[in-house]
Amino acid sequence: MSRDLHTTAGKIEDLRDRVEEAIHAGSERAVEKQHSKGKKSARERIDLLVDPDSFTEIDEFARHRSTQFGMEKNRPYGDGVVIGTATVDGRPIALYSQDFTVMGGSLGEVHAEKIVKIAEFALKSGIPLIGINDSGGARIQEGVASLNGYGKIFRLNTRSSGVIPQISLILGPCAGGSAYSPALTDFTVMVNETSHMFITGPDVIKTVTGEEVGMEELGGARTHNTRTGNSHYLAENEDDAIDYVKALLSYLPSNNMDATPHLPPTETLEKKASDIALDTLIPDSPNQPYDMKVLIQALVDEGEFLEVHALYAPNIVVCIESVNLKEFTFINKSLNQHLHVIRLIWAIRNQRIKCDI
C-alpha cells in the first residue's frame, strides 16, 4: 500500500514501518537458530537487563555504507548492534547489544561508530557502560574500516578506565578484534558452554601450529574463569549472567566522583549468634585452615556479599559488600585453599582487583 509522504499521516506510518523493520532486522530463521542454541536476541537481552519501558534507542536507522562484495544489496537497519540508554533499579546506564542475527554481529564501520557514540556518551555523562557481546569479529567485507573502528573502541575503553564502570557480558562468540575490548573493561561475565572468547579460532591454530584444540579449551567460559582470569563470573545461563550484572551494579558508584548507591539501614548493633561464633572461628593451631567466607559473612550487612573471580586463584577471596551502609572490597586469603601460600596466580588476581579499585 503506497503512502503519501507529503502528509503527516503518511510520514507517521512510514516511520512506524521503519521502526518495525529495525526491531526485526534479523531474519526469522536467524532468530530461530539463535534460540535453538539457548541464546536470546539482542533486544530480549536488553529487556531482561533494564527497568521496564526505560530503554531509549539511539541510531536505530543507521546502515552501513559499504559497496564492496555486493554489500549494497544488504543494508539492514541498526547494522548489527543496538545502542541506547536505560535505567537499572532506577539508576541510569548506557549500553550496547550486538545482534548476531544480523551479519553475525560482525563489526563494520557504522557498527563501530555506534558503539563509540554510546561509549562517549557514558563517559561524558558519568554513567556505567554495559556491553553485550555476541560477534564473529571484524566484518571482512569492510576491510581496514573495521579495524579502525576497533581502535576507536579500545581507545575509549582505556580513557574510561577508572572513571566509569565498564562491564562486558559475553553471551556468544567473541572472536578476533572483539576479544580485546572485554579484556580492557572492569568486569567480564561469561556463560558456561555458550560463551567463547579468543583472538584466533581452532581452525587457524591447527593450520598454523598443527595443534588441535577445541573451542571450550581454547576460549570457553570455564577456561577464562579458571585459567586466564579474563572472566570474573561463570554463569549457568543468560538469565544468571544478567542477574549477576544487575547485582554488581547495585554495589558500584556511577563514576569515580559519585558516592556508592544508598542502601536502607537494616542492621542493628545487637549481638547475634553469628557474632559469637567468630570467637571460635580461628583455630588455635596456625596450621589448621578455616573458612574466610564465614568471617566475611558475619562482618557485612545482611550477611550478603558479591564474590568476584570465584574460580580463579581460589586461595584468595575477593568480594564486594557493604558494611554499615558503606561499600567495600574485601581481599582475603582463603585459608581453606593452599594454607599461607602466595602463588603467582594469587598475586596477579590481588594486583588486578586493586588496580580496578
Residue ranges and their predicted role:
Residues 1-167, 173, 178-180, 184-204, ...:
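Terminal-region recognition feature
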